[in-house]
Amino acid sequence: QRCIRDRYKWGGFDTPRQFAERLKADAANGGAPAAAGDMGTPEKQAAGDAAVSRFAAGVDCSGFVSRCWRLSRRFSTRELPALSISLPSWDELKTGDILIAPGRHVLLFIRWEGAEKDRFLGSEAGPLPVWKCAERVFSRPMLENSGYRPMRYRGMRD
C-alpha cells in the first residue's frame, strides 16, 4: 500500500495545496490551523452534507474522484452515477474508471494485477485503517460481492 499525503475528511474536496495551506491557517476556523482530516461514521453517512466539518481539511472518497476527474465541485457517491455510464463487464475497466457502491464508497481503478483479473490496483480516500488517500491492491470478488459496480465518467477520453 502506498499512502499519499492528504488525509480523509468526510465531505472534503481540498486540493493538496489547499490541504497544506489550511493546516497552517484556516479562514473558516478564524485563522487557526484546521485539523488534518476526520473520520467517516454511520452517523455522518446518515446526515450527509449536514455532517461536514468546517474545522477539518482533507478529501473524502467522492471528493477524491471528483478532483481526479477535474470536476468543478465534489459530487457525492449518490451523484457520481449520473455523470457515468455503467460498464457491461468488470473486464472492460480502464485507468480512471470507478468502482462504486452508491451512497457508501467509491474508488478509482488503475490497472489489473495479473491475467486472471481478480485483483487490481486502485486508489481511494479513506477508509480504515489509514484514513488518507492511498493506492492498494483490491479483490474483485470481494467488491463484487459487496455491491460495487464498474462505471466510466461520460467525459473520459481515450
Kindly give the residue locations of the regions a language model identified.
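Histidine-centered active-site/metal-ligand motif
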Residues: 104-105
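Structural motif
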Residues: 94-98
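Aromatic- and glycine-rich peptidoglycan recognition patches
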Residues: 79-90, 109-158
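Surface-exposed patches in mature extracellular/periplasmic domains of secreted proteins
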Residues: 5-8, 75-82
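Short alpha-helical patches at coil-to-helix transitions and adjacent helical residues
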Residues: 58-62, 93, 151
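N-terminal capping segments
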Residues: 1, 5-62
